[in-house]
Curated annotation (Swiss-Prot):
Domain KH: 554-613
Family the entry assigns: Belongs to the polyribonucleotide nucleotidyltransferase family.
Broad enzyme group: transferase
Localisation: Cytoplasm
Keyword annotations from UniProtKB, A to Z: Cytoplasm, Magnesium, Metal-binding, Nucleotidyltransferase, RNA-binding, Transferase
Catalytic activity: RNA(n+1) + phosphate = RNA(n) + a ribonucleoside 5'-diphosphate
InterPro entries, A to Z: ExoRNase_PH_dom1 (IPR001247), ExoRNase_PH_dom2 (IPR015847), ExoRNase_PH_dom2_sf (IPR036345), KH_dom (IPR004087), KH_dom_type_1 (IPR004088), KH_dom_type_1_sf (IPR036612), NA-bd_OB-fold (IPR012340), PNPase (IPR012162)
Protein name per its UniProtKB record: Polyribonucleotide nucleotidyltransferase
E.C. code: 2.7.7.8
Purpose: Involved in mRNA degradation. Catalyzes the phosphorolysis of single-stranded polyribonucleotides processively in the 3'- to 5'-direction.
Natural source organism: Rhizobium leguminosarum bv. trifolii (strain WSM2304)
Residues annotated as domain S1 motif: 623-691
GO cellular component: cytosol
Length: 712
């Protein structure tokens, strides 16, 4: 019934198995991939023909984690998986980025790649395996795909590169880098690092590229026995149309791209585009080409002209040379009632970034396949349509916004203080108010400024820069701080963030083969210079974290209590802790290890809560005098609440120095009294005395003390 084919290899000390022919046989391509004991199913379906009028390649990648893969049941009322998590969105992008450039230009058939995690061994992260499985499924599908693509994770532990480290090894690693590519080219890099230099980062990229070569061999081996017949796809040849367009409009287009101001340049290019349409769509004549074809070729021509100009003149669209960064203005304290704020403007790219400090209650609970964990640093990136002068949808963040936010998050996180050093939850929101390239790197810079303005003790300021690279034959140009117009015409786009001493995040997207290690080294060196320049400009606003928190930020005091006292502080059904919160106004968070965080914008509220908790967990000392409240009277004495929630008995003989006939003759419920702790009886009950204490002053009465000692 099944025509199953399997290839197995040993990869980084663990077995990798690729299997096809048994599951999801109606898909164009399907591969069940196993690494260690983590299993993913990747499927590919591509429409047989493009939709009429389709003018782009509609590729969709969906990565999904099923909770059953880790032996769990989803939370929530419906008990089933809901909308994609942040990780699912990020891994979908991770798979998409290296495979998209390998589809031939002109292929516009609706294509969907679905990767499902069906088993997780809690040792091997499914993201790299998913990339491999998707590549294998595409290679088998018969869809025009110039792969295969391989992928690998690289760690850096004790000065050594590690291929595909286990999840628990990543805690020791100063690098988390994922690299993908073909036999002869690196196509994608995504990373987070702890201030590593350019040489180490580039070495990791090349180490990973070498490390996934056996995976490419395995995919080819599987394709030799299981691949479907390649679909017949011949891209249209529009070289004749391009030549005619060049002949008539090259000069005008070149003039348009000499205009350095974005809006004026767009207007000039649109005017040329209108002339192109008039030329190729004369009235009363049947057009030779469709509007979609004319638009696509014109766009291609725009890219060519800009690339030629840059390579020939070493001058950019906006008049800059290759390495100059646009003018930068950094401001902090823009919104004084927020906890920390910054406005970062670089050319026509601008971000308002606001930092908010919260308590442990504000931490984000993340339910992943590897278990529930809490995240104390949140960074949210928003890209409203007005930032590029357009109208558009407003609502929940899209994949791009989530991806850009995570890139900035990775860049900043290595410089954050530990929870012990700074027990706050941090949320940063970046509102992109203008965009003309590199808004994610503006977010990095603005986040660094806003956190320092908020008084967060960042180890060092962090800056980011977006770079481009153009390669034609043996000529190449590296562009620093690229514009939006330059973003798509380059052969390599990469973003580097870090401090003055090293890289904290590197993201690369390489679209062609031929970009050598030496070229990447030159590009990273130029990026280092740009990053240093931006850090210098940021320093004009603020150089280090403020010595104190903002006026409106909460204060947090940390204290530790014995674990066996946690129940007493919380109380039955949370009664005690609720009372402390209500009476003092402070927020209280208690960890399982006995760490107590007390938060409030008022120092008095924090101190009141601290004293209350201390009175609950501390043990009263024999011989000490305490203030208390009579909570109950009886024939044999009075019960007094003292030392927090603790009660003790003042026997009728200890109420006063003279003989007392009735307890109520001396005290009533609600009376404030001074008591001395005499000790504990054989059952552990507290024995108190009032008669040895002056009820007016709270001081011990010397004569009564002597009598007491004589009696003992």
């Amino acid at each position: 019934m099944f025509d199953t084919h399997t290839v197995e290899i040993e990869w980084a000390g663990r077995p990798l198995k690729l299997e096809t022919g048994k599951i999801a046989r109606q898909a164009d391509g399907a591969v069940l991939a196993t690494y260690g004991e983590t299993v993913v199913l990747a499927t590919v379906v591509s429409a047989k023909a493009p939709k009429p009028g389709q003018d782009f390649f509609p590729l969709t990648v969906n990565y999904q984690e099923k909770t059953y893969a880790a032996g769990k049941i989803p939370g929530g009322y419906f008990k089933r998986e809901g909308r994609p998590s942040e990780k699912e969105t990020l891994v979908s992008r991770l798979i998409d980025r290296p495979i998209r450039p390998l589809f031939p230009e002109g292929y516009k058939n609706d294509t969907q790649v679905v990767v499902t995690v069906v088993q997780h061994d809690l040792e091997n992260d499914p993201d790299v395996l998913s990339m491999v499985a998707a590549s294998a499924a595409l290679t088998l599908s018969g869809v025009p795909f110039m792969g295969p693509v391989g992928g690998a994770r690289v760690g850096y532990i004790n000065g050594e590169y590690v291929l595909n480290p286990h999840l628990d090894e990543m805690d020791e690693s100063s690098l988390d880098l994922v690299v993908a590519g073909t036999y002869d080219a690196v196509l994608m890099v995504e990373s987070e690092a702890k201030e590593l230099n350019e040489e180490v980062m580039l070495g990791a990229v090349m180490f990973g590229h070498k490390g996934f070569q056996p995976v490419l061999d395995a995919i080819i081996k599987l394709a030799e026995v299981a691949a479907k017949e390649p679909r017949d796809f011949q891209p249209e040849d529009y070289s004749e149309l391009e030549a005619e367009m060049l002949k008539h409009f090259e000069a005008e287009l070149r003039e348009g791209y000499k205009i350095t101001q974005k809006a004026d340049r767009y207007a000039a290019v649109d005017a040329v585009k209108a002339k192109v349409k008039a030329h190729f769509f004369p009235e009363g004549v049947e057009p030779k080409y469709t509007a979609e074809v004319i638009g696509a070729v014109f766009k291609h021509l725009q890219a060519k002209i800009v690339r030629w100009n840059i390579l020939d003149t070493k001058s950019r669209i906006d008049g800059r040379d290759l390495s100059t960064v646009r003018p930068i203005v950094s401001e902090v304290g823009l919104l004084p009632r927020t906890h920390g704020s910054a406005l970062f403007t670089r050319g026509e790219t601008q971000a308002i970034v606001v930092a908010t400090l919260g308590t442990g209650e504000d931490e984000q609970y993340v339910d992943s396949l590897t278990g529930m964990y809490k995240e104390r640093f949140l960074l949210h990136y928003n890209f409203p349509p007005y930032s590029v002068g357009e109208t558009g949808r407003m609502g929940s963040p899209g994949r791009r916004e989530i991806g850009h936010g995570k890139l900035a998050w990775r860049a900043i996180r290595p410089m954050l203080p530990t929870a012990e050093q700074f027990p706050y939850t941090l949320r940063v929101v970046s509102e992109i108010t203008e965009s003309n390239g590199s808004s994610s790197m503006a977010t990095v810079c603005g986040t660094s400024l806003a956190l320092m303005d908020a008084g967060v003790p960042l180890a060092k300021p962090v800056a980011g820069i977006a770079m481009g690279l153009i390669l034609e034959g043996d000529r190449f140009a590296v562009l620093s701080d690229i514009l939006g117009d330059e973003d798509h015409l380059g052969d390599m786009d990469f973003k580097v963030a870090g401090t003055a001493d090293g890289i904290t995040s590197l993201q690369m997207d390489i679209k062609i083969a031929g970009i050598t290690e030496e070229i990447m080294k030159v590009a990273l060196g130029q990026a280092q210079g740009g990053r240093a320049h931006i850090l210098g400009e940021m320093a004009k606003a603020i150089t280090e974290s403020r010595g104190q928190l903002g006026e409106f930020a909460p204060r947090i005091e940390v204290m530790n209590i014995p674990v066996d006292k946690i129940r007493e502080v919380i109380g039955s059904g949370g009664k005690v802790i609720r009372e402390i919160v209500e009476k003092t106004g402070a927020k209280i968070n208690i960890e399982d290890d006995g760490t107590v965080k007390i938060a409030s914008s008022s120092g008095k509220e924090i101190e009141a809560a601290r004293k209350w908790i201390h009175s609950i967990v501390a043990e009263p000392e024999i011989g000490q005098i305490y203030e208390g409240t009579v909570v109950k009277t009886a024939d044999f004495g009075a019960f007094v609440n003292f030392f927090g929630a603790r009660d003790g008995l003042v026997h009728i003989s200890q109420l006063a120095s003279e003989r007392v006939a009735k307890t109520q003759d001396v005290v009533k419920e609600g009376d404030k009294v001074w008591v001395k702790l005499l000790g504990f009886d054989e059952r552990g009950k507290v024995r108190l005395s009032m008669k040895v204490v002056d009820q007016a002053t709270g001081q011990e009465i010397p004569n009564e003390k002597k009598k007491e000692e004589a009696a003992e």
